[in-house]
Amino acid sequence: AFAGILSDADIAAGLQSCQAADSFSCKTFFAKSGLHSKSKDQLTKVFGVIDRDKSGYIEEDELKKFLQNFDGKARDLTDKETAEFLKEGDTDGDGKIGVEEFVVLVTKG
């Protein structure tokens, strides 16, 4: 799904950083996987993969499954991790992350 954007090694490095429950940090994942240095167009494509229901937003249930977009065998995020991820990315307080919010979240480092 991320061909031409992330290599398998980049994805593995990102997943390696958050194997234990409650160890996920979106900033760490974005940095380790190299997502933080991608273009807005590339990040918009990544957003489209994570937005599984194609609503134009990443909702809480999609955040919980975030890691599985990168590896189908990856774990669900815990409720705590999901809530922190949402809080980091949802700058307008509507309870979901839009594409602009996602691009800012990934690139702000």
Curated annotation (Swiss-Prot):
Binding-site positions, Ca(2+) 1: 51, 53, 55, 57, 59, 62
Span of domain EF-hand: 38-73, 77-109
Source taxon at top rank: Eukaryota
GO CC list: cytoplasm
UniProt GO molecular function: calcium ion binding
Amino acids binding Ca(2+) 2: 90, 92, 94, 96, 101
Pfam families cross-referenced by the UniProt entry: EF-hand_7
CDD domains assigned to the protein according to its UniProt record, in alphabetical order: EFh_parvalbumin_beta (cd16255)
Assigned keywords, A-Z: Calcium, Metal-binding, Muscle protein, Repeat
Family label: Belongs to the parvalbumin family.
Function of the molecule: In muscle, parvalbumin is thought to be involved in relaxation after contraction. It binds two calcium ions.
Protein name according to UniProt: Parvalbumin beta
Organism (species): Boa constrictor
